[in-house]
């Protein structure tokens, strides 16, 4: 391409003007449910239809998508960093202990992104697609419907070390669990109890409950807070020397439905993993037990609390305005970030 000094000067001027317009318009942008109303209203239908199609062959996918969103937001905020693959510059969060061989649903997000890019190129971030997908997944499983605040942008890197430290482990005590939530700004008891209700559907691997079943706290005995009948059921599914990747339902009552039965289970000492049952059985649970009882007694109370907590979680340090980028492929940072930013500026200015 031949580029004269005059054309370069014009291009530079336009770039400067575009950047000023963009900065003045969205540098202090706040998340809003109407963010894509004019630029990509079809994103919601695209995401929902993708999940509906996937559910036909994979009933677990709704719970898996919700978990992806949770694991994304707890690591440097909801920035789609969990979706990035390994590079020479950083290690993927997919390799971190809380995600390795358990986080799933990435190809489904890829299909959503490809369809959204066809409909609305360079417009919707991967972070927002994952956020919308989590909401739609919950609703399709029988849970509440709500309008999610949008306008996030995508991280330029992954945070492997942070994923290993920020994500709560299945064997956490209640004080440890509270600390992990407070660490990301979720300091209300209702944040912890309502978001834990995401375990009302989906599955978990035997390896994460073996200590509860056979050697709790190195006692050689099962967790004393575990219902004895439920203990025998779980031991049948997860024998001492069996395959520890076998999957067990989080909710023995309605395993694929998003409802309040998770809390009913906790009251009966039938929480699957330690962090679940801690909400009701820990000596430190004086502020969580009343919420477990409240949500067990009323589905709508749980739904209302869950929506509020999801929106609070979705607002953990989002990238907005000129921060980050809008990835074209959720697995990789845009190969030419400067050129892509110029295109974004031109697109934005032309839409004003």
UniProtKB/Swiss-Prot annotation:
Disulfide bonds join 40-120, 73-78, 126-330, 206-238. Glycans are attached at residues 86, 215, 227, 243, 284. Its cofactor is heme b; Ca(2+). InterPro entries: Haem_peroxidase, Haem_peroxidase_sf, Peroxidase_pln, Peroxidases_AS, Peroxidases_heam-ligand_BS, Secretory_peroxidase. Induction: Late induced by infection with an incompatible bacterial plant pathogen. The keyword Glycoprotein applies. Heme b binds at residue 199. Strongly expressed in roots. It is an enzyme of class 1 (oxidoreductase). The modification Pyrrolidone carboxylic acid is found at residue 30. The record marks 67 as: Transition state stabilizer. Its main location: secreted. Ca(2+) 1 binds at residues 72, 75, 77, 79, 81. Substrate binds at residue 168. PROSITE patterns: PEROXIDASE_1, PEROXIDASE_2, PEROXIDASE_4. GO terms for biological process: hydrogen peroxide catabolic process; response to oxidative stress; response to salt stress. It comes from the Eukaryota. Keywords: Calcium, Disulfide bond, Glycoprotein, Heme, Hydrogen peroxide, Iron, Metal-binding, Oxidoreductase, Peroxidase, Pyrrolidone carboxylic acid, Secreted, Signal, Vacuole. GO terms for molecular function: heme binding; lactoperoxidase activity; metal ion binding. There are 73 peroxidase genes in A.thaliana. Removal of H(2)O(2), oxidation of toxic reductants, biosynthesis and degradation of lignin, suberization, auxin catabolism, response to environmental stresses such as wounding, pathogen attack and oxidative stress. These functions might be dependent on each isozyme/isoform in each plant tissue. Exhibits a Ca(2+)-pectate binding affinity which could be interpreted in vivo as a specificity to interact with the pectic structure of the cell wall. This is Peroxidase 32. It comes from Arabidopsis thaliana (Mouse-ear cress).
